[in-house]
Amino acid sequence: LSGSILLNTLGGLYVDAERFNKMSTAEAIEYIDSHYYEYIEYDARKTDETFKDASKAEKAIYIVEDFKAYYMSDGICAYFCNDGDTFASDLTSSMREIGLNDAADTIDDFIEKNNIDYSRYIEANEETEENKYPYAAIDNKLASTFDSQCNETIAKYAKSHANELQYIMK
């Protein structure tokens, strides 16, 4: 592939937008996952300060990648119950921005039906929170809406906004 590759400040490789856009979906997702997970771990504060210079696309991908990491490891409760999440109130709008509308609808319906307030950081006891709501049911429903669409949708969105992704592009 043509285009430049640079070493980022965290020790990983950066590619430019031209090279990124030539990647297959699988390659793009592997690149996105490794760079965002690295960034998420590096900037574990997860506050609005994290995004002070970020584009709308950067923030949306970061939030969905953060959710994906929790969800794929232990289900949706891992995201919402593990001390809450600073950006939980932005999750479904970020999903919609990227194009994961069915998953966003599923989560919004779950929150509404269970009268859950994730608009602030929750100091939660994971075990207590997990037993309050039917998380297994939403995990099953998300398996058909999020799991099947997330990687392709994230890759497509990232490619169409590659020039705005300052944290993973150079």
Model-predicted regions and their roles:
Residues L10-A88, S94-K170:
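Extended, alpha-helix-rich binding/interface surfaces that flank or overlap catalytic cores
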